[in-house]
């Protein structure tokens, strides 16, 4: 086990905002990142950017003071998923995720892989139902439950495996906080400030609505990354959340 990123080098943020980086060019991504303050948000790196630019890109972001949510949604046999999660912890990320549909043995193995990291371990979150999926999409897979019911079933399995929380839609947050408790973290994509286009997300909410629903960390992408003044956009979102708190 080798920790490659020191948490002491990062800025401390109390903001629930996680900005999704979706760039095809590393320089463009870093140019955007250099316009914003790590005290105002964390950053999410997904499959495309990690595949294109690798661990070094994550280190570049960490060196700028940002906490990183490594959104790779591991879904594999238990041993492979566990090694992947441990590799993410070695990289020093703040949060990493797996697919809850990988099952209890996979999630348990992933959690156990983080034990040696102690307090430096990242948050381990499970994905329930992708926010782009509707009931008809689940039916195509042979799942007869509604997206909300299926997500709750997967969330219950996640908590049973002692993970830190789940990725879920904002619409499920109120129910999940009631069922799973305040300590079970809810990470929600599809969050868009008032007036933003829905894009490819189907189940969306504004940041204020998400906060009221019990969302702990809200993922926001294009409304920030495509903003003329992303730093000001972030400050406005955080200010609105503080007023709503």
Curated annotation (Swiss-Prot):
<feature type="binding site">
    <location>
        <position position="44"/>
    </location>
    <ligand>
        <name>substrate</name>
    </ligand>
</feature>
<dbReference type="GO" id="GO:0005829">
    <property type="term" value="C:cytosol"/>
</dbReference>
<dbReference type="InterPro" id="IPR014732">
    <property type="entry name" value="OMPdecase"/>
</dbReference>
<feature type="binding site">
    <location>
        <begin position="71"/>
        <end position="80"/>
    </location>
    <ligand>
        <name>substrate</name>
    </ligand>
</feature>
<dbReference type="InterPro" id="IPR047596">
    <property type="entry name" value="OMPdecase_bac"/>
</dbReference>
<dbReference type="GO" id="GO:0004590">
    <property type="term" value="F:orotidine-5'-phosphate decarboxylase activity"/>
</dbReference>
<keyword id="KW-0456">Lyase</keyword>
<feature type="binding site">
    <location>
        <position position="221"/>
    </location>
    <ligand>
        <name>substrate</name>
    </ligand>
</feature>
<comment type="function">
    <text>Catalyzes the decarboxylation of orotidine 5'-monophosphate (OMP) to uridine 5'-monophosphate (UMP).</text>
</comment>
<feature type="binding site">
    <location>
        <position position="192"/>
    </location>
    <ligand>
        <name>substrate</name>
    </ligand>
</feature>
<comment type="similarity">
    <text>Belongs to the OMP decarboxylase family. Type 1 subfamily.</text>
</comment>
<feature type="binding site">
    <location>
        <position position="131"/>
    </location>
    <ligand>
        <name>substrate</name>
    </ligand>
</feature>
<dbReference type="Pfam" id="PF00215">
    <property type="entry name" value="OMPdecase"/>
</dbReference>
<keyword id="KW-0210">Decarboxylase</keyword>
<dbReference type="InterPro" id="IPR011060">
    <property type="entry name" value="RibuloseP-bd_barrel"/>
</dbReference>
<feature type="binding site">
    <location>
        <position position="22"/>
    </location>
    <ligand>
        <name>substrate</name>
    </ligand>
</feature>
<dbReference type="InterPro" id="IPR018089">
    <property type="entry name" value="OMPdecase_AS"/>
</dbReference>
<comment type="pathway">
    <text>Pyrimidine metabolism; UMP biosynthesis via de novo pathway; UMP from orotate: step 2/2.</text>
</comment>
<feature type="active site" description="Proton donor">
    <location>
        <position position="73"/>
    </location>
</feature>
<protein>
    <recommendedName>
        <fullName>Orotidine 5'-phosphate decarboxylase</fullName>
        <ecNumber>4.1.1.23</ecNumber>
    </recommendedName>
</protein>
<feature type="binding site">
    <location>
        <position position="201"/>
    </location>
    <ligand>
        <name>substrate</name>
    </ligand>
</feature>
<dbReference type="InterPro" id="IPR013785">
    <property type="entry name" value="Aldolase_TIM"/>
</dbReference>
<dbReference type="GO" id="GO:0006207">
    <property type="term" value="P:'de novo' pyrimidine nucleobase biosynthetic process"/>
</dbReference>
<comment type="subunit">
    <text>Homodimer.</text>
</comment>
<dbReference type="InterPro" id="IPR001754">
    <property type="entry name" value="OMPdeCOase_dom"/>
</dbReference>
<keyword id="KW-0665">Pyrimidine biosynthesis</keyword>
<dbReference type="GO" id="GO:0044205">
    <property type="term" value="P:'de novo' UMP biosynthetic process"/>
</dbReference>
<feature type="binding site">
    <location>
        <position position="222"/>
    </location>
    <ligand>
        <name>substrate</name>
    </ligand>
</feature>
